[in-house]
Amino acid sequence: MGTVSLAVQLFIVFLLTSYLLNKYSTIRKQNPIVTISTFIGWYFSLIIVFVLPLDVAITFFHKCENDRQRVLNTTSTPAPIVPECELPGGYVPDDVLFDLWRVVYWSAQILTWLILPLLQSYVTAGNFTIFGKIRAAVINNTVYYAIYSLCFLAILIYAMFKGVSINIENLKVILVSASNTWGLFLLVVLLGHGLVELPRSLWHHGNRHYRLRKTYFDIEKLASEKSEAEENVKEIYKKVRVLFNSMKNDQNGQRRKVRTILSKFSDDVIDQLFPSRQVIDNASMEEIGDYCSEAKLINLHKKTIYAVQTLNNATAQWKVLVDRALFLENLAFSESNGYNLDLARNICVPVGVRRFWYTRLQTPFCRVLGVVTVFMTFFVLFSECTFFVVSYTVSPAAFVTEYASNRFHYKYTQFVAFGIIVYLITCAYFTIFRLQIYKYYHLDPNGHTDENSILFSAILLCRLTPPICLNFLGMIHMDSHVSMAKSFGVETQFTKLMGHLDVIPILAKGINIYLPICIILLCAIHYYRVGAYVLHNIGFDQFVESDEMTNDMINSGRSLVQIERNSIKRSNERNQRNQSWTNTITSNTSTTSNAVNKYKRSRKNEEERPMLEEEEEMEEVSSTTRISLSPTEHPSSSGFFDDM
């Protein structure tokens, strides 16, 4: 029964991973290897939400059995009086859980250190053959692997100086410790951001005025990046097009390679940048001749991939921001004037329920949720700073877990552990899904994420899986070698697989000292927005309230949104006129056809009239047709105002 319950939980994670992958990427347009690798990385990273609390509950069950056996061995109390240890919900044998952890851990490690970095370089390589892309990916990652090999060698030499015997088991522990140490530093950075920004984002989400101003600012900030990306793509496309037209024959397969480069420019991109499909030739033949070599074509291909990727990211972000600004403006207008908010129909949720949510429930719900997450943030921070104190149970996470196991039943610790691990994962993964690295990494929730960004997110998630588990077990005093507690007596299956960091003394002691300090320091930096103020003062655009430059950008963003609104309005009116004009033509054509047929039938058995009278009648019919076909208003040319 426990195995079936675990299988159901894993299936739920499978559905959640499929939903997220479909939400953030276009599966049909991606390389299947990229999709499969990313899915596995995300899936194993989300599995710990259910597997780790189950491991904790089963460990408490083993502790209960050990305590019961100790009581039976040291006292003369009859066996029926000593309470039996009840199996936790979803109990599975230790070997099943251990094998599951082994698959999850080593698959995540192989993905994050070997497969995913190679795939990242593969999808961005400019080579034209599969072998060439693989070769370029290996060369690009050579420096990457060399640096990490040197770090592992340094840790190995340090362990030898400390007297650690170098055998297979210790080598595995040293390798795992080195990987987890890097993951812990990454976790500290992500938690330092997520523990502060998640409650702040929820609180601001309930403030529509703030959201609208922030959206205006982001639109103005993105406008210059989008314009720069468009100009870059235009320049590259002109060069590639002229190069393709200059090659009259396919000598050495060069024309075929240039055609491959041209295929990277989709029809949507070309229609957006060149509405009239006229490419102006600004490149001289001398400049074009430099691109005829293999190396130059590979470099041009790589630049094309990067430029198109940057433009697609900017366009996707632009559409999301403009739609958000228009919706918030409509919402504010409907509330201030007492009108009902006009919403598109949805199959799942009725319009009335959605309107009530946006106008009445969203703000108080987000504020309450923000207060709850603030409490959870202080709960986690205090636990991080006190988990190494074991003389008394000071860590709130350890205290709640122990209280649930002693006061109620140890099986309730599974629910407590589930709540804590969900918040930790939410804060860490919130940063990953919201993170934006300029022109390199951005996850778009509307399915426009490029392959490089989706692979980079899988690398981060796989790298975070073991550190999150290790940090959580230390917070609740379940890893004795982290918390230095010696009285628990049993270990989780995760700890049995991983080993302990105390094989390397500097790592074992450093976690207790530097991990809490770094998290508190980063949380303070993000809370006071030190980084934003520093970047703002040195010239980078940052959203700073009550700042003149920020207000100017907000006003500029509002003007851009108004331009987009007018453009959409003209487009809708033009479509309505065209549709009305089409319906009018269809109706008049049908009426004219019926009149002619009726005329022919009525004249079939009558005597022939004079030629002049017949000509006058046909001229009258023709004149009527011409008048009905003449539109009362001349339709505007398609896209005329949009081009302006």
Swiss-Prot record:
It is a multi-pass membrane protein. The keyword GTP-binding does not apply. GO terms for cellular component: membrane; plasma membrane. Residues 28-31, 124-145, 194-369, 434-453, 524-644 are cytoplasmic. The chain crosses the membrane at residues 5-27, 32-52, 103-123, 146-166, 173-193, 370-390, 413-433, 454-474, 503-523. Keywords: Cell membrane, Coiled coil, Glycoprotein, Membrane, Transmembrane, Transmembrane helix. Glycans are attached at N73. Residues 216-245 form a coiled coil. Residues 567-576 have a biased composition (Basic and acidic residues). Residues 1-4, 53-102, 167-172, 391-412, 475-502 are extracellular. InterPro entries: GPCR-associated_LMBR1, LMBR1-like_membr_prot. May associate with G-protein coupled receptors and regulate downstream signaling pathways. This is G-protein coupled receptor-associated protein LMBRD2. The lineage of its organism: Eukaryota, Metazoa, Ecdysozoa, Nematoda, Chromadorea.
